[in-house]
């Protein structure tokens, strides 16, 4: 009888334990939330076109040949915002001229006029004074390139290279500072505190 009592007590304890575990399972709940946060992108592309009569077409990759002193060549430069975020934009324009023998010549014989709303930042860059929306593009940086009418014989068979390098930074949480200009916004590559 003692064994039966112990067996009965053990059996009741097990039943109570199993019941308690089952009840505990009914009062527990679990859930997982997956949150996806995607940042915007700042991407740009230099767009170079030219006016051929009344038709605007892509500027030829091989350039223009047969340019004479005093010539003006159509070269329209804009910057397109291909990213998903609004951006501030600046550009640097480099000009080099190489003779037919590949000697570097004075590049001041090549000129262009920067259009509004672009401004010379005085630091080697031209700044676009308006924010450019995603998918949008700037107005023309310049529309034509001029060659000095006083170019000498050393410029025969020369090649002029005009390089346009563009940079962009986000406008979100990056306004033009009070009493500042677009040149003063944070994040420009090479600026203090920017890697």
Name each model feature, range by range.
Residues 1-11:
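N-terminal Sec-pathway targeting helices
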């Amino acid at each position: 009888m003692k064994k039966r009592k112990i067996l009965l007590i053990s059996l009741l304890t097990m039943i109570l334990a199993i019941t308690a575990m089952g009840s505990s399972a009914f009062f527990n709940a679990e859930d997982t939330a997956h949150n996806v946060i995607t940042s915007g992108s700042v991407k740009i592309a230099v767009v170079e076109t030219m006016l051929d009569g009344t038709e605007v077409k892509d500027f030829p990759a091989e350039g223009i040949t047969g340019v004479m002193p005093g010539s003006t060549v159509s070269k329209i430069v804009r910057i397109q915002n291909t990213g998903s975020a609004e951006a501030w934009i600046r550009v640097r324009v480099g000009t080099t001229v190489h003779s037919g023998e590949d000697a570097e010549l004075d590049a001041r014989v090549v000129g262009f006029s920067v259009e509004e709303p672009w401004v010379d930042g005085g630091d080697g860059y031209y700044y676009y004074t308006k924010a450019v929306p995603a998918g949008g593009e700037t107005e023309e940086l310049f529309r034509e390139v001029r060659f000095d009418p006083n170019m000498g014989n050393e410029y025969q068979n020369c090649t002029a290279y005009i390089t346009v390098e563009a940079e962009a930074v986000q406008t979100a949480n990056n306004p033009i500072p009070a009493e500042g200009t677009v040149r003063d916004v944070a994040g420009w590559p090479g600026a203090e505190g920017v890697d």
